[in-house]
Amino acid sequence: MATPPYAELHCLSNYSFLRGASHPEELVARAWALGYQGLAITDECSLAGAVRAHTGLAELRRDLRAAADAPEASAQDRLLAERAEQFRLVFGAEFRLACGLKLVLLAKNRAGYGNLSALITLARQRSEKGSYRLVRADLDAISPAGAVPDCYALWLPDAASSAEDAHWFARRFGERGWLAVELHSGADDAAWLGRTAELAAAAGLPRLAAGDVHMHLRGRRPLQDTLTAIRLGTTVFEAGTALHPNGERHLRHPLRLARLYPAELLEAAARLALACDFQLDTLRYEYPQEIVPAGETPASYLRRETQAGLARRYPQGVPPAIADNVEQELALIIELGYEPFFLTVYDIVCFARDEGILCQGRGSAANSIVCYALGITEVDPARASLLFGRFISRERDEPPDIDVDFEHDRRETVIQYIYGKYGRDRAALAATVIRYRTRGALRDAGRALGFGQPQIDALARSLAWWDKRDQLPARLIELGLDPASPRVAKWLDLTGMLIGFPRHLSQHVGGFVISRGPLGRLVPIENAAMPERSVIQWDKEDLEALGLLKVDVLALGMLSVIRRSLELVGRRRGAPFALPHIPPKDAATFDMLCAADSVGVFQVESRAQMAMLPRLRPRQFYDLVVQVAIVRPGPIQGDMVHPYLTNRADPAASARTLARLPADVRAVLERTLGVPIFQEQVMKLAEVAAGFTPGEADQLRRAMASWRQKGHIERFKQKLRDGMKARGHDSDFADALCRQIEGFGEYGFPESHAASFALLAYASAWLKRHEPEAFLCGLLNSQPMGFYAPAQLLQDARRHGVEVRPVDVTASAWDATLEDLPADPDAGRRPAVRLGLREISGFPEAAALRVAEARAAAPFADTNDLARRAALQRRELDLLAAAGALQALAGHRRQAAWQVAGVCLQGDLFDAAPPPEAAVALAAPQEAEELLADYAATGFSLGRHPLALLRARLARGRFLQAAALARTPDRALVRVAGIVTGRQRPGTAQGVIFVTLEDETGSANVVVYAGLAERQRRELLGARLLGVFGQLQREGEVVHLLAKRLVDLSPWVGGLAARSRDFH
């Protein structure tokens, strides 16, 4: 029997969240493999999965075409490739109207796609995130030409549908309307065929076959049932008729369909699919134009602003090489039509600067002198020897990527400026697809299968974030569950299937899409969870696949720190102080970094970076660029760190390495001592050593970013080998280069990105070294951010001689401030840091502002005066008393609590009662009580360190102080104990976990190997005070303790509320 023609026109992917049970790519591949003529992805009121289906088909076609073009290709290979080219992918959406009517709309052409996208936008934007609402009249609201013009419509009747419904549908859509017949091997199939024939005949509607597909294979039915139960908040055993009665809602073979449907219904579906000729790659993005002044073109305005910027950047005259490069960049930007893109970013950056918001571009944009001239980036590409081809090239099939960081707590001002300038119909944030991870999958699958919440919680809590599915059986056994039990085994299977599945859309961290016309006709827009935000239904990868513009408006906490610190420095010095005022080659700053004294310093504060600093010993800015980039998985996995450090420590070894390299390769690697550290170097090596064009080199970079998932790098490796062989390089050199490229994988760090971050690393290091009080204020006032909690930042600052004064309601503002500013900024006396009321956990900013305002009018006489004039609530007074912030008004904590209890607040039941009895003199708390109260209220203490109080007990247990490790011989067996302040597990560490312990003398770095981490995971993950028995390892100035055994000493510190920043 010949395979009948068929195309599936009603198919939900897993982007119909918690409904569809297959990825769009799986559905496309399966439909093609079954011999379908086409497939429509029709997710519910959504086009979120459209690009995935589009790229899935493109990859299928590319692979089949490559096989067909191979010398050994058969006629069958060529036939398969041709059939893939003819396969029709249709874009549509399913809708349930408020009246209950169910429709599928299919885009006939570009206009129809725009109308479909606009309808989804309308339905989504009138509802809260995750829902939509559509009424019959909305179908006519999209266009005056009628009901969603240029779209075909399928009506999906149910048992309650009437002839009136059929007539309404026929009137609305006329010749564009079809009644879809959906059969799923049920006992009533024959009756339903008859009933749909009656409805169609009554309204003169044609019929076609459809499948209400939810999965590509029948085997996904258990997952589909589970998704339904999760969506409904029930179990698969209680979901009842909400579950499909069988597994027939998968892509079925056309021969099987031929036994269910009349042939003409199958043929009608195939014909309609072929009538839809819209494809996503025909979408054309149009840039905004209002940023161009009247009388100018985008090209002339960009050129004028670039030249003006160059004059500011090079006041002594633009070097000829720079001028030549600018002309080359401008010519290529104008040729590719990217001028409005650059001007859009320029406008946003100008707004931020006008508002005093610190910002800086990073990433590949730092390769561009045009970006540098416009003030978008701060790294001089000429000085840094960067590579413009990394940013823009003719061969790139996507726009350039410009990422700009803004102060993290003022970025919303920038976001609202963009919405205000372009309107919410033309600007929206890109989406981020939130996918299931192990714990979430475990919890949802467990609930859907009816497991008890205690069992689910116990298993989820026993997992660490790094645990994979193959470690679940061991966790189950620990909890007394049998992994071989059918029900438990099903739990594990479903958990594994859920991992990586999309669950819902969220908003991108800052990727804006801005268009000239209505954005909702390009991609659907929906409301974000955050107020005043809107989000498109496509994510970053979708936008890149279609070559659509995205402006990244990102948040960076260190910019907030630096801006706040610079303001305080200016106040202390009596004159404005900005980034350009920081001396660029300060020896004391580099001395500090070489000693790994970098707590709080941007990018070099992690334990891995601290371990590298004394080995690399940065003495100039470019050394910092390397420092930022080298402690990354790419250089580590590519085995580049040790050779670089060896060559840096031994100039003769470096000279020998460089001498062995061909001259063209030597020119690329000379600055990094013969070792490739940056992505740009890999790209340039491909050009000079293997003859790649700049565009091909950029394609290599992109393949490096995804080779682990997609294996795209293999074809480039062969091209590299062939190109190097043709240029006389031996095979050993070619193999070594390929190994290094693979090592970079998705973790290669661009030099342009490292240079941008190194600027901020140096600025923050200079502030720490020369203005530590202002820097501490900046760090505290910008929390949460960085690797360290306020407790560790305060400990470090005080060890550096910074005087820190406690939170005090008679002196503290909301933020930390400087006190005792000397009249002469060069005087030896330093200012003190007064902690802000923000440090009191739970104390509201509004209350702090009232306190400051009332205090500015007159000092507080007592707690009653404070409560009355600052209009404080009972809970706010209690928080101040518990934090010791009423010391100046009421004395110690117990006395303050007593006084606060006696304060009569306006509106209290007894606010007219007589004055309370005279205050009772209460004994002051003991030191340990004060310590516990400090940590409970603020997370830190300015008193003695908790371990100072325990030192005698620790000494009896032969636990060394952290400072003593520096004097301890290599390989010595020692014991150390400390408050856990951080746990880290780098992706390249092969299961090793790095733990930071703090005591009264400093920090100890502990290395816990994977085996011990698994055996003692409870102690490792749960201890607040951790004892470690281990062997000391010394490499130069770097000291680590290799753990042999862990002991949870937390009972020794009672209820101490110490906070650790884990796996940050």
From Swiss-Prot:
A single cellular component GO annotation: cytoplasm
Q: What is its EC number?
A: 2.7.7.7
Task: Give the GO biological process terms.
Answer: DNA repair; DNA replication
Q: Which lineage do the record's taxonomy fields give for this organism? A: Bacteria, Pseudomonadati, Pseudomonadota, Betaproteobacteria, Rhodocyclales
Task: Return the similarity comment.
Answer: Belongs to the DNA polymerase type-C family. DnaE2 subfamily.
The protein's enzyme class: transferase
Is Nucleotidyltransferase given among the entry's keywords?
yes
Quote the SMART domains the UniProt record gives: POLIIIAc
Question: Corresponding gene?
Answer: dnaE2
Keyword terms of this UniProt record: Cytoplasm, DNA damage, DNA repair, DNA replication, DNA-directed DNA polymerase, Nucleotidyltransferase, Transferase
What chemistry does it catalyse, as a reaction equation?
Answer: DNA(n) + a 2'-deoxyribonucleoside 5'-triphosphate = DNA(n+1) + diphosphate
What is the protein name stated in its UniProt record?
A: Error-prone DNA polymerase
Q: What is its main location?
A: cytoplasm
Keyword field contains DNA repair = yes
Role according to the record: DNA polymerase involved in damage-induced mutagenesis and translesion synthesis (TLS). It is not the major replicative DNA polymerase.
Q: List the disulfide bonds.
A: none
Q: Where in the cell is it found?
A: Cytoplasm
GO MF terms, alphabetically ordered:
3'-5' exonuclease activity; DNA-directed DNA polymerase activity; nucleic acid binding
